Design a protein with these regions (language model features):
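N-terminal export signals
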Residues: 4, 10-31
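C-terminal segment of N-terminal export signals and the immediately downstream linker at the start
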Residues: 27-54
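N-terminal structural segment of carbohydrate-active enzymes
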Residues: 44-95, 127
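Glycine-rich, aromatic-flanked loop segments that form ligand/cofactor-binding clefts
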Residues: 57, 85-89, 116-163, 200
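The substrate-binding groove and active-site-proximal loops of carbohydrate-active enzymes
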Residues: 58-69, 100-114, 165-184, 237-252, ...
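Aromatic-lined carbohydrate-binding/catalytic grooves of carbohydrate-active enzymes
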Residues: 82-114, 139-151, 215
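Active-site-adjacent "subsite" loops/lids of carbohydrate-active enzymes
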Residues: 137-194, 229-244
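Substrate-binding cleft/loops of secretory-pathway carbohydrate-active enzymes
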Residues: 143, 207-210, 251, 255-265, ...
């Protein structure tokens, strides 16, 4: 399928609707005068080879019923016409867009015998594009809750948390076995099947405090404190301060686990966690900057009045 070139107006409207990944690579600022030949020297030690080669990212965030109706040729043509040299493609986590073999990894109900992710990765490779696969571990379905209730986030009153926007789903605990075991297996499966350049993890750092059995036991073992309750603690409370540091270290440990798992399969790959608004992140951005050669901020246009320059503003 071949389409005529974009007008400027059409390009702005389409990119706003499609969403974007704002990528900063390398992380350390540099002037345009130093760009080009010095790229390799500017990257942190151990940076993957593709980092300095990508400058225009596209993101395709599929929804569950897309496998039955999306147009592969349209999107590959779109990537060409926008001169994108890298793509972030939704692959798994909440919903799998490929024939996963991992128990409880929910396949799109519209997937059938298709491999939507595989088709997209193959098409992008033919265009000589770098590829990240986007996963999202923040929610799951009733079968997982029934089989593994300890994977579900729990509120301060001890209630398992239903999803705030999708009541058929459950919110998962970011700091327990769902991420450390189940999502590690998902990342490994994706990397083994497609050998992509990396995996971008959306909503990986939790959806507020969790009081599940794993969080209670792990926090107590690490600090000696009981989990602080939001209603009765302040930033000066020793338990609250300990929780902030413990949560951050737990997430950095998770990042390290995922990164090591995919690099064992493809040494030139990386895990790239979503850092959101960066300055608004609850994690220490200095530490994050020392750990990675690339940051990514998943900036979505969820409202009709979102301006097309919002992605660039978020990245800055």
């Amino acid at each position: 399928m071949t389409m005529p070139p974009f007008t400027r107006r059409e390009f702005l409207k389409t990119t706003t609707a499609a969403g974007a990944v704002a990528a900063l690579a390398p992380f350390a600022p540099r002037s345009l005068a130093n760009a080009g030949a010095d790229d390799a020297a500017a990257l942190p030690a151990g940076a993957p080879s593709w980092i300095g080669k990508t400058s225009r990212w596209a993101q395709l965030t599929l929804v569950e019923d897309d496998p039955g109706k999306y147009d592969l040729a349209f999107w590959l043509d779109y990537f060409q016409r926008t001169r994108s040299d890298a793509a972030c493609l939704r692959g798994g986590g909440c919903v799998a867009y490929y024939p996963t073999q991992i128990p409880f990894h929910h396949r799109s109900a519209w997937l059938g015998d298709r491999d939507v992710l595989g088709d997209l990765v193959s098409g992008c490779r033919k265009l000589d594009m770098s590829v990240l696969v986007r996963t999202d571990p923040h929610a799951t379905y009733d079968d997982v809750q029934a089989a593994h209730p300890d994977w579900i986030a729990v509120d301060a009153q001890g209630n398992p948390r239903r999803h705030w926007a999708s009541p058929e789903m459950w919110v998962t605990c970011a700091l327990g076995p769902y991420n450390f075991e189940f999502m590690t297996a998902v990342n490994e499966e994706i990397m083994s099947r497609y050998r992509v350049d990396g995996i971008f993890i959306n909503r990986w750092d939790g959806s507020g405090p969790c009081f599940c059995v794993h969080c209670q036991e792990n926090f107590k073992a690490a600090t000696g404190f009981d989990l602080p309750r939001p209603a009765d603690s302040s930033p000066q409370d020793p338990a609250r301060r300990a929780y902030i540091l413990w949560r951050q270290q737990r997430l950095f440990d998770l990042w390290g686990l995922w990164d090591a798992a995919v690099r064992k399969i493809n040494p030139d790959s990386r895990v790239v966690p979503n850092t959101g608004g960066c300055a608004l992140s609850s994690l220490d951005m200095k530490i994050i900057g020392e750990r990675t050669a690339m940051l990514a901020a998943d900036r979505q246009a969820r409202h009709g009045l979102t301006p097309p320059w919002a992605c660039g503003k978020n990245a800055k």
